C-alpha cells in the first residue's frame, strides 16, 4: 500500500448528519469479497432513481457536474454510523474518496477507514461549517490535507486536527493489519521454528 502524506483535492459537500453504512453501500451489493467494484453503488439509493443504478438522481449533490472527480468528502457529525460492514469504506475508496472531513465518525467506521488508507479528519462543528460555506460558494474549491503536519488548508485558512500516533504511522507508511504483521515476519518465523512439531 502507498502511504498517505498530503493530498489536495476537489471537495463534495454532503450536508447530512448521521449517514449510516446502509446508506453508504446498501446491503444488496455486499455479495463480493474483493474490495473493488463497490464505488458504482456508493450511496446507490440516493444517487439513482432506479434499482439498477442507471438513472441518476439530478437532485443528489454527488451527481452535480461541479463535483465530479471529488476526492474529499465533507460531511456532518456521526458519519459512518450503523452496522460495522467494512464495505462502506471500500465503496468510498473505490469511488475515489481519499479524505473525509466531519465533526465526528462512528468508531468502527473510523478504524476501518484508516485500515483502508483513507484519512478521516475530525474538525469542530464551526470549522466544518466554514468549510461547507467555502465549498458551496466556490465552484471547484479544493482543500489540502497534510497528514505530516496534521493540518487542513482551505481558502487561505489552516485548521489543525489530531490522529493518534499509531494510526498516523500506519497511514503515513501505507500499513494495514497485514502490513504491520509482515514487518515482524522474521521474528514470527523464528518463533515458529522453536515450536515442537507435535504442536504444529
UniProtKB/Swiss-Prot annotation:
It catalyses: (2R,3S)-3-isopropylmalate = (2S)-2-isopropylmalate. CDD domains: IPMI_Swivel. One of its GO terms (cellular component) is 3-isopropylmalate dehydratase complex. Its EC number is 4.2.1.33. GO terms for biological process: L-leucine biosynthetic process. The keyword Lyase applies. It comes from the Bacteria. The keyword Ligase does not apply. Keywords: Amino-acid biosynthesis, Branched-chain amino acid biosynthesis, Leucine biosynthesis, Lyase. It is an enzyme of class 4 (lyase). Gene3D superfamilies: Aconitase, domain 4. One of its GO terms (molecular function) is 3-isopropylmalate dehydratase activity. InterPro entries: 3-IsopropMal_deHydase_ssu (IPR004431), Aconitase/3IPM_dehydase_swvl (IPR015928), AconitaseA/IPMdHydase_ssu_swvl (IPR000573), IPMI_Swivel (IPR033940), LeuD (IPR050075). Pathway: Amino-acid biosynthesis; L-leucine biosynthesis; L-leucine from 3-methyl-2-oxobutanoate: step 2/4. Catalyzes the isomerization between 2-isopropylmalate and 3-isopropylmalate, via the formation of 2-isopropylmaleate. Heterodimer of LeuC and LeuD. Belongs to the LeuD family. LeuD type 1 subfamily. This is 3-isopropylmalate dehydratase small subunit. The gene is leuD.
Amino acid at each position: 500500500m502507498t502511504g498517505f502524506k498530503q493530498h489536495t483535492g476537489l471537495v463534495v459537500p454532503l450536508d447530512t448528519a448521521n449517514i449510516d453504512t446502509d446508506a453508504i453501500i446498501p446491503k444488496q451489493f455486499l455479495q463480493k469479497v474483493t474490495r473493488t467494484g463497490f464505488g458504482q453503488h456508493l450511496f446507490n439509493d440516493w444517487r439513482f432513481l432506479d434499482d439498477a443504478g442507471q438513472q441518476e438522481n439530478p437532485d443528489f449533490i454527488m451527481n452535480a457536474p461541479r463535483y465530479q472527480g471529488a476526492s474529499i468528502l465533507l460531511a456532518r457529525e456521526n458519519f459512518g454510523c450503523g452496522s460495522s460492514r467494512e464495505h462502506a469504506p471500500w465503496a468510498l475508496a473505490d469511488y475515489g474518496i481519499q479524505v473525509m472531513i466531519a465533526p465526528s465518525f462512528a468508531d468502527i467506521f473510523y478504524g476501518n477507514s484508516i485500515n483502508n488508507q483513507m484519512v478521516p479528519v475530525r474538525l469542530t462543528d464551526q470549522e466544518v461549517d466554514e468549510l461547507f460555506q467555502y465549498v458551496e460558494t466556490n465552484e471547484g474549491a479544493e482543500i489540502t490535507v497534510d497528514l505530516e503536519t496534521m493540518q487542513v488548508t482551505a481558502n487561505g485558512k489552516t485548521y489543525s486536527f489530531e490522529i493518534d500516533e499509531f494510526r498516523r504511522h500506519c497511514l503515513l507508511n501505507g500499513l494495514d493489519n497485514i502490513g504491520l504483521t509482515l514487518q515482524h515476519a522474521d521474528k514470527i518465523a523464528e518463533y515458529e521454528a522453536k515450536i515442537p512439531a507435535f504442536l504444529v
